Amino acid sequence: MTSRLSTVLLVCWWTLAACQDATPVQGPTETISTGRVLGKRLDVLGKSVDAFLGIPYGEAPIGELRFRSPVARQPWEGTYNATTHGYGCYQVPDESFPGFEGSEMWNPNVRLSEDCLNLNVWAPHPRPSNAAVLVWVYGGSYISGVDSLDVYDGKTLAAEEGVIVVSMNYRMGALGFLAMGDESAPGNQGLRDQALAFQWVQDNVAVFGGDPSQVTLFGESAGAASIALHMISPESMGLFKRAALESAGLSVPWGYYTVEEGTRRGMLLAAALNCDTDTGGSALSPSQVVDCLRRRDVVEILADQWVTTDYLDFPFVPALDGTFLTERPESAQQRGAVKDCELLIGSNTNEGTFFLIYEVPGFSKDSDSLLDRDGFGTALKYAFPRANSFGLSALDYQYTPWLRPNDPALLRDAVDQATGDYNFACPTYEMALSYARTGQSVYYYRFTDRASNNPWPAWMGVLHADEIAYLFGLPLHPEKGFNSQEAALSRRMMRYWANFARTGNPNGASGSDWPLYTVETQEFLTLNKSLVDGQITIGRGPFAQACAFWREYYPTLLTQTGDISEAERVWKQQFSDWSTKYMVNWKAEFDSYVNGKQCE
């Protein structure tokens, strides 16, 4: 008897769905469209919250469903045990800094499986009536992420603000974004997973006290980029009312590819797994390639899916498939062909540093990453691999700290600024401006607060994703190591986001801290601990100059210098060197002379 019980428990541990009836019904239960679910009641800072974790919203995308669009979950018999998180979707954990909290906090904390289409709901107890709903979409470069991370725990936001919080897992990497141009692997599987979860919210959130007509999507990085794509997709525009985007927008340069490029990358993956040709050496069709990939072990796919080599060029991303995405995101943005909704959007001070330490020469977590002029040029060349010599010279000129052009710390910070502007900050700025032009209500923020317990070195500043902990209320829990001011800032930010979800205005009914962002004023709110002391800092035109460079000058320069003759290229390069590098050297000599030193 003991042996048999042990076997049952072991099987349950490995596959929760197979044992959904094994747990006695103790705790809060609700009946949703697919059956009955059992949750657990939590005490959160003296308030009660019911958590329903790991609820399946899609069938397991395995076998013939691998690489296909998701299929809604069929009803089950009995009561589903939703007291623990479900499986996370397959990914490769970050092992760059073993044991280091700053990177380990983003690694999966649950078992991984292809059977990962599940979601979580946190609802206040007693149940509210027609409460606003906040649906979280995690980031992770479209290759990693899981909804069970401590930093994504929705219990505190639900408890403090009386809102319903939902989060979901979705497929990533090749499993989520392989695009081969036909129905066998149409592309955008991960985005369609998200949309299926949004539909689940529409169908079921009222059971938990939520209002399906008051759904706000919020997400960070690739999660925010995903939401931006839902804002232009004909397949998902009707599934939510508002959007809050952190550190990404429609024009992120890493956010999509054409089906042709997706197919090219898919064939590289196929070649690595011997799925590109038949036994006679003849090339396989895309559907035959996909059939072969379906028979490969998922671990093999994960091991070989990184088919790109450029910096911040993620291997499998959303595709312009003609159905979910019918035009280039930046074109839709320029035309104003976007969802009619209120928008909250912004970015952090140092968006680039987190990525620089992984790939760019001269940058390290374990040093101050100081750069000389040569190191500055090398870093720019690596961070912008598609720039020709004229583009690199323009970057050098635009981001050189001209007041002290040889200062190693300023040169380091300038590479962070260039990387952050291009990949994250300017896409948020451009989307805010575009939305404001359509007459929509837009609220822009700049998060500038470095937490007292931040494990990353001080030079890295306020990193990409640092704001997330504040939005989920982690600083309110003493064991997390934040101070009292950070806890107060977290309360303020949760209130802003919840007010936005309730009314479309982060200020709520009577506040006026956060000004409306308009084309004329371009005002934004600075989010840091000074807010706690009543010091409200309003900025204007956060990146107008820098983003004009990326929007207007830089792409035009690359286009116009892409096919010039060698003689003209050399002459222009020499002129560019004179206007940047040699001017820096001249200024250094002049400064030495002014300071009473002998020029050499």
What are these regions (language model features)?
Residues D50, E114-L117, R192-A195, Q199, ...:
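A structural signal for well-ordered alpha-helical segments within the folded catalytic domains
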Residues R4-S6, C12, F100-S287, T323-T326, ...:
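Serine-hydrolase-like catalytic core of hydrolytic proteins
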Residues S251, C292-A487, Y496, T503, ...:
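Substrate-gating cap/lid region and adjacent catalytic-acid/histidine neighborhood
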Residues W13-L191, P212, L312, P475, ...:
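Non-catalytic accessory segments of hydrolases
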Residues R171-A174, F218-A222, Y445-N454, S512-E520, ...:
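Short, solvent-exposed turn/loop segments enriched in Gly/Ser/Thr/Pro and often Arg
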Residues V338-F390, G534-Q598:
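C-terminal, loop-rich substrate-recognition/catalytic regions characterized by aromatic stacking residues
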Residues S213-V215, N274-C292, D304, D407, ...:
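Surface-exposed patches in mature extracellular/periplasmic domains of secreted proteins
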Residues Y57, V71, W76, L293, ...:
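Bulky hydrophobic/aromatic "packing anchor" residues in well-ordered structure
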